[in-house]
Every structure is written in structure tokens, then in C-alpha cells.
Amino acid sequence: MTGPLQRRAIADGVWFSRIHDPKFYHNSISVTIITPLAEGKTSAAVLAAYLLRMGSRRCRDMTELECRLADLYGAVLDTDVSRHGENQLLTFSIAGADDRFALEGESISRGCAELLGEILLEPKVEGDAFPEEAFRLEQQYLIDTIEAEINDKRSYAAQRCTAEMGRGCRFALPRYGTVQETLSATPKEAYDRYRELIRTARIEIFFSGCGSPDYAEEVFTKLFDGVERAPLCPTPQRLPLRAERVTELAEQLPMSQSKLVLGFRTGLPQQRRVRTALRVMTALLGGSTGSRLFTNVRERLGCCYYCGARVNLLTGILLIECGLEEANRERLQSAILAEIADLAAGHITPQELSHIKLAFQSSLCSIGDSLARTEGWYLSGLLQGDPITPQQDMEEIASITAEEVAAAAAALTLDTVFFLQAVGKEDGCDED
């Protein structure tokens, strides 16, 4: 990338960001609706996002929508639903060739911005509700998606541990909602939730690529100029900093290997440098094939099939996820805790710290290879409140000391142990 993020408000609670990178031959425009996860409203928001991607008042079906995309030199439209800390994110994006490749001098970026804005703000409706037939199709698709989550046993175990640690907190709510919530939703409720989000949610718009964002900014400024906005400013929930006791939970499922998840509180550091040290410590502990958990616990002790660590800086939760034979459970858990204690004691060699920093450097250098990853990087930074460039992050990581890594490990407190016991292989299923 040639420069950092340039961002300005174009409406109340609506922000337009520019990221210029001349090495690409195309541009990406994304609109992310950011709203706190809310029990009873999550599924309706997802259904609304799925229905918006089906067309608009001027594109009454997928055939017409595909024709519009074809006229824009094969532009690609995408929709994504995700969770970031306490927030639900609904992202709509379009990618198209740069204007200089237009055969008749037209602006492809303007056309892409107009189509994306049309899909977002001029949905296809019947009266004051989404079309019944389209709603039922998307409702069943969402139910199937939610019910299929348990098929990924590793992800399911991590979600169960996180939900227990976040009991009573917004971040513990499922990103898609529940089957019951989805079944009880109606086309009108989904449309009402959509209108509520357009009025109250924080909205981040990105234009990234080689071209000029001026047309896109003009389009969205005019569009939101006609939208009634009353953005909400939710108060962040107070999250636990340390574990008061260890909660142990267990479930059984038909599968070929058991899963063990250890959930730790990290102290929820607020200073960026302390958070960076926590990231480095997590990577050193279990973030790569050169980490302690992989080298010592998996390879040397041989007491698990996999063992890795990841941290969520917004919730202050670090998870260690393992696949194992049940007979190795106690030995595995003891070995993991011993590795954390060893890091906390400061037993960190310059060589292993250097290797982890090089791994970070490689990963951060690759962010600029994709416009989607670049936008995701800056959006994540905005949600954390301190966006920096990947280069700035590399420089800070390079300066982290072994003492800072040890302090991050010493701040960990074990909160929850979730064990998913294998009770026989499920027919036709291989979750490993």
C-alpha cells in the first residue's frame, strides 16, 4: 500500500474510507453495517442481509442482477455476516475493473457504487415486508446453516467454551442467531430490522484499489443525504478481567476424536503495546508449527492430534484448542499449563522470539496482496479504536521484548475447561 487510511464522515454515523494501492487493476467497494449483537434480533438481521443480496427494486430477480454485473465488466457482488467482539457485522461488497479499462470511457467505479447503494437502500419489497417466497428460501438456508455448525466439531467446541465464558454478555450470542429465532421470524420483522439498522447502525464504507474513490464517495454521500439517521451509541459491556474460579463442562457427540478447549482471561489490556505483546505471546505459545504447543506438546509428548492458541483482543479471551484421545486428557492439560508457566517465568530464547516475529512479518506483508484483507485489517483496527498500518504493526512487534511476552503469559487465568467427548464415530462424518 502507498499510504494509510483516509477517512471522513459523510453522514451521521456513516464513514467513507479511502485506501489507495496502484499495484491492483481493480477496485473494491464495501459497506459494513455494525450493530451490537441483540438477543431476539440477530437472525432477523442475517435474513435481511441475505435478502438484500437477491436484488433491488430495479433488479427484480437474479437474472436482472447478473445482467447489471455483466454490464459492469463482470463485477462481483458478495455478502458476509460476521461477529467482531460484541458486534454483528453485515458486509456488502462489489469488486470491479478500474475505470481506465472501460471501452467507452464510462465510469465502472460509479456504476459499481450505484448498484451497491441501490441494493443497500432500495431493496425489493412487497408493501412493508420482504417478498414472502424469497424470505422462505433464505429462512430455510439460514436454518440449514445454523444446524450445520455442529458438524465442525472443533469450531463447535470453541463456541461452547466462549459462550460459557461470556454468559450474560453480547459477544456470547451466536452470530447467526438460533433456529427457533429464525423459525419465528417473518418477512415484515426482517424488513423492520433492516430499516432499524439503516437508521441506527454505525456504517463503514471502504473504497480500495488503484482508482479514484471520488465517484463512489459522491454516490454514497448523496444516497445517505436522503436517509433519516439516529445512530445508537451503545455502552460497551464490562467484561471480566480475571477468572475467579475454573468452570468445567463436558458434552458427548459421535465423532472419532475428542476435543478439549481451555479458555483463559487475559486481563483485557487497553494499551496497544500490551495487546501487541499478548498477540506475540499467543503466537509463541500456540500460533504456528514453531510454537511451544506444537513443538513440545504435540510433537515431543505426542499427547494430541492438534493443539493451538488464539486470542480475541475485544473480549479478552484466549482459547487453546486440542484434538485428543480421551486417555490423554489430564496429561495434555498439565502439559499446556506447564508451557504457560514456563513462558510466564521468562524462559524465552532470543531464537524462538525472533522466529515468531518473522512469522508475523510474513503474515503482515501479505495483507496488501488482497483488497479484501486490506479492508478487513483497517476495519478491525477501527473497531478496536486504534487503526494503524501493517508496517506500523510490524515495527511495534519487532520491538516487543521477552519480558513483555512473559508479562502477558503471567496475566492469563484459566476460566473454563470444555471437553467434547467422542463416543463413537458418526456415520459418514469425519470432523478431523
What are these model-derived regions, one by one?
Residues 125, 151, 199:
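Catalytic domains that recognize anionic headgroups
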Residues 82-84, 191-198, 308-312, 406-410:
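Short, flexible, solvent-exposed loop/turn segments with mixed acidic/basic and small polar residues
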Residues 142-150, 161, 165:
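Glycine-rich, mobile lid/loop segments that gate access to catalytic sites or pores
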Residues 17-19, 25-45, 62-118, 154-177, ...:
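M16 family metallopeptidases and their MPP-like homologs
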Residues 55-58, 100-103, 122-131:
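Short, polar/flexible loop-turn hinges at active-site or ligand-entry regions and domain interfaces
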Residues 184-192:
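Active-site glycine-rich loop that binds ribose-phosphate moieties when present
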Residues 66, 122-146, 234-242, 338, ...:
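Acidic/histidine-enriched alpha-helical segments
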Residues 1-75, 104, 178, 191-296, ...:
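His/Glu-rich zincin catalytic helix
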